[in-house]
Structures are given as C-alpha cells and as structure tokens.
Amino acid sequence: GADDTATHELALWQVHEIAAGSTLSLGKVAAGARSYLLIAGGIDCPQYLGSRATFTLGQFGGHAGRALRSGDTLPLADLAECHLPALTRLPEALIPQGAGAVNEAQGKNDQGKTTGREWQIGVLYGPHGAPDFFTEDDISTFFGHRWEVHYNSSRTGVRLIGPRPQWARADGGEAGLHPSNIHDNAYAFGTIDFTGDMPVILGPDGPSLGGFVCPATVVRAERWKLGQLAAGDRIRFVALTLEEARAIEVQQDAVIAALASGQLDTLEQRQAETSGATLSAIAAKRPRPDDSPVLKCLSAEQGGEQIVYRRAGDDFLLIEFGQMELDIALRFRAHAWMLWLKEHPLPGLMEMTPGIRSLQLHYDPRSLTLETLMAHLEQAEVALKDVEDIEIEARTVHLPLSWDDPACQQAIDKYQRSVRPDAPWCPSNLEFIRRINGLADEAAVRETVLNARYLVMGLGDVYLGAPVATPLDPRQRLVTTKYNPARTWTAENSVGIGGAYLCVYGMEGPGGYQFVGRTLQMWNRYRRTEHFTTPWLLRVFDQLRFHPVSHEALEQIRRDHPQGRYDLKIEKTRFRLADYQAQITEHQAETDAFRERRQAAFQQEIDDWHARGQFTFEDQINEVQEADSLSDDELGIETPVTGSLWKLEVAEGDDVEAGQVVALVESMKMEVEIRTHTAGRVVRLPIKEGSGVAPGQPLIVLSTAVEATDSADASAPDNARSTLSSEETL
C-alpha cells in the first residue's frame, strides 16, 4: 500500500496504544525540566546492585550505564505481567500546572531579564543550624531569600545562586579552612549542602558522604520537585514541622492510592487538600524555623562522650559523638553503635551509615516514628558508655601512587581556566599543601604522605567505595582546605587531601580535595577477581600504605588491576583501640609541637587570604551580558534556556542556512544546540564564549538583507537529505 506519513498529536497525562512500526517523537519540555515516558511492562534491563536505574557518573545500571544514543535497541518486558491502570487519562483538573510551581509563567525582573518559574519547597531545618555553624541572620536569610537555580545543575545536585552566609565559625578547624567544612558525615537524601559559600540540593545521584554543613533537608513528599527545577527557576524554602511534613505525605499517599484505584471523587478531594496553598499558608505563618535541628544532647558523663541527635529531614537521624575534632576513638564509638543496632534490630530502620564522628540512621516514617527510634537508642546510650576495649580485624593494603600525576595537573589547569583563576591552591596543589602546613619544601610533603599509614574511616566519600582516611600518627596529619568552589572535573582514582583527610576518588566527577597523585581503581563494575570479591576494593578500618610509581607504570597497573592481573599486596592485621590510645599518649608532647607549627602556618594562610581578598569567592559565571539592540533588517538568534555559551560554531561574515547549528549552550549538564530558522549572514556576535546567557537573549545577530551566497544550494529537496527508515530508528 501507499506510505502512511500521517502525524498524530498525543495528549500528555494519558495512556496511549501505539501501533507496531510507529515512530514516537518527543518535543520540547514546556514546563519544568524533565518529561517522562512510561512503557507498559517497562524496559527489560538487568539489575545492578538491586536497581535498574541508570547512574551515568558510575557508568552502570539502565542501558549500558549511559544515556541513550541513536541506534540503541531497548528490549521490552513481558506484557503478560502488565496490568493497565484503572484510569487511562488523568482528569484535567488534576493535571499539575507548571509542573507544580507556585508561578508557572516566566517573566522579567527589575533589569528586564527573563526569570524562571517560582517554587515553594517544604524542608525541615537541619541537621546543621544556628548558632553552631550559621548565625541566626544566616538562617533568616536562607529561608527568606528566593534562590535561583544555576545552569550547572543535574541529577547529582541542584546548584543555587544567592547570598553568601556570614558563618558562625572562623574556619572548620581540622576539617578544613572554610567554615562550611566539617568532619565527614553521611548526607540525607535531598539535603541542602553548602560546598563553601554555595548551596547545592543533593539529588538522587548525589554523594552519600561528605564534609560540608547542611542547614535544611527537603522532605520526602516534596522531593519530586527537584526533578523539575530548571535553570533560572527561583525557589523559596518553607520551614515545616515534622508533623506538617508527615501530614503532607499522608495526603500525597492518599492521592496516589486513589489514582491507582480509579476513585475519582476521592482523588479530587485529596488533590484539593494537597494544593500549593498549604505551603503558602505555612510560609506566611512561619517565615523561618522556630525550633532547633538538635533534638537531644547528652553530656560526656551521661553517654561516655557527648552525644548530639540532629534531625536530617523526615526520614534521617544524624547522631554525632564527642567534640568537633578528629579523634579515632569517636569513629570506633560510631562503629560500636552500629554493631549494637545490628544486634538489636528495629523494624523500619532501613540503613546505617557511619561518618568520621557520627552515625546516620535512615528509617521509614510510615512504619517507625522518630519517637520510637529515639526511645530505642536510649538503650544504646546505657550499653555503650565505654568502648576502649574494642578490637577489630583489619588489613594493610599497599597502593601504588603516581605522584603529581598528569591527570591531576589537567584537572588543576581546567579549574584555573574555567572556574577560579586566582585560587590560592593554583597552579600547584602540592605547593599549597606545603605552604599551609609550614613544611620546608614539596619533598617534605611527599615524604609525609608516603611514610604515613592511613586508617580508612569511611567508604563512599564521595562515590563508589572511595575511602576517606587519616594518618594513624597525628604527627603525619597534613591539613588543607577544600576547593571553593568545587572542581567540576576530577580524574577517576585521583588522590587528594581535604582537611586532615585523604580521599581516593572512586570515579570521574566533581571534587574539592587538594591533589597529591593518582592510584589504581577502587571499584570494579562487573568483574570479580581475587581482590574484588565485591565491586568495592576496600573495607572500613583498612590501613593504606602508598609507594611511588611512574605515570607509565600506573597506566599499566590500571589496565591489569580490574582484570585480576595485578599482584596487590594485602596483609592481615588487628587493631585494638586501647593500645592505639596508649601510643598516642606516649608521643603527646611531639604531637602538640607539630600541631602548633601547623596551626601557625594555617593561620598565616588565612591572614594572607584576607589581605588579598581571597577568603570568599563570588561566582561570576552566571552574570548575563546585556543584549545589543537590533535594527529593522537584523534578526537575533536567541537561546531558549538559561546557561553558559559553551561554543560558537560561526564567525562574523559567515553565511548560514536555515536549520544550521550556530552555537552550543551548556545547561543542566547538557549541550543545547542553537539553530537558525532562516538563512542570513552573521554580522555580530554580541556574547563571548563562557558567558552566562538567559532565555530570549540573542547570541548571534544575522542580517536578513544580505542574501546568503549558497542559500539556493541549501534548499535541496527533501528526498536528497539523510533520512532514517523505521527499521533504523528501532
């Protein structure tokens, strides 16, 4: 028969039956940031660590661990097991407008620049607040300000633009130079993490462990909004109580249950109860939190060490032990609590994640209330006052280290060129480490790192089994600050120091530790070998020793290690806390002298930063250049999104065709192609590469009065252009 080229527009929020051989085309997202396509039965892809979700940074899960590409084939699951929903179309009145934003329409600010949608997002205050980490004014500003979503956002985290905190502390002590730095603890889902002076809402692909303060956490019922925040949108955080957060979730659960069962009357009633007016009313009543994130505090006499319980959203509890200092005994106390909770299980307690001096508990508030959990923990307070006799099995793992590896130098160079040209740790992280620790030369830095025995205090800092470790001997603890702002790129398995801690990056991604070199893989995605009996290589309380190798030798080791062809030296040992404490006491005078010298150099660095105006950093990346006015015969090629002008594909004087790609804009970790819709000649390029851009802003100015020299050739018939058959698109 004849070709059927008919095109049918399909409504959203509706179940459709698609005929075999059809092609489904998806257009632009009109509201929010993401659109979702659900297929009956789902896509048949293998599970990885119990999930089919794609983790592109880790390169596993989903389809080949990456974003889809043209030509990929996706097998569908067995439709025999699929049950269609009772409702095949969502009633018009129940369809969220503007993806749930308070104000869905884009408008203009006082300067006439395009602004995005405005959102209200419900959060719980904590785990970190005033007066410990922030000032009271900081907290008022945080909840009173309308934060703007930065274009450099993704599933890892939503970066925000807004006022810089004044901070309650001068610095982070041994955790780092900046007052946002703390000793690493686990992060709750949806927590708002201040990486230096810049807040980031941690998303589903965000880190599980890190060393930055978090003043608020998005509650469970509000986390869906994180997936629809687009660059340029504005957010106001609404301070909820735990009871309000729970009530919103109960209502939301009822809406979903009514939707699944097709009970329209119940659904409309529940939808009305969960309208945005609820958050607006709460915000008007409570412009900032009127409670504390600290739920309970025990003295050292009551708990063996000071114990602080901090609220971290409506399904996490952060327990901190002792003072805010690096003390290995506190890590063992957290370990003892975790063992006790394993021996005394509590229904609804889903996960435990230890930090340097903390233990975070993830619980299901539907089945376990916070009050019940806190009552259960009172038994641990009594049972675990003394942990000095604890003894554990451990290993010494000998790792190769390519000192000042070219991959580290590349990351530093990229950071200096694209993020912060005047950073005090550039162009050499090693020189910065030397200077801030008062060492004679870089050789002394190398000697200290290679002679130290590093105790692994936690895994997953930041991802994929990455260890956070510290020298057992306090006289070998080098202290640095972390990058502010963080790097956008770090090579896999780079080794760095941040605060008093060493980290091996488990995968390529952002980072903030000061580089010393690079080592072998910490994670093996698919292959099991003698040393990779699990995907992760290391265990908590392993002791790491580094030995130097050349860059070329490391490259060969990195090829052999995942295949099981590298002879990694691992020795079994034991660690008894009481014996270690005795050794520390024996060398206390030397340790105190070392700390005094280090602190003097540390303070000198701070003073120098203040003198040079480098203690704080103001992000200029998002500043938008003003657009030139256009004459009658000129046409501006505009950007549809907020972002950064990544690359210009044309130069002044070039003739362009209709549909030609003329620029690339980076937004939300994606490259957006900017195409012309008409032919013309480029007469001006008003925006420089690397500049911030906003919707409606002309990136390229064309003259429509000038006839493009080859425009006739550009208008070739459709059948002369490249096409894909239906078989090729499957």
Kindly label every feature range from the protein language model.
Residues 222, 227, 530-531, 646-655, ...:
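Short histidine-centered loop motifs in beta-beta connectors
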Residues 1-624, 726-728:
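Conserved "landmark" site that anchors the functional core of diverse proteins
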Residues 242, 363, 368, 658, ...:
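Long, charge-rich, low-complexity alpha-helical segments
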Residues 620-661, 673, 679:
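Acidic, low-complexity mobile loops and tails
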Residues 610-637, 642, 667, 701-719, ...:
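Periplasmic scaffold and linker elements that assemble and bridge Gram-negative envelope complexes
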Residues 183, 349, 645, 682-684:
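A broad structural signal for short, well-ordered beta-strand segments within beta-sheet-rich domains
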Residues 24, 74-75, 232, 654-675, ...:
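Short hydrophobic beta/alpha edge segments that flank linear recognition/processing sites
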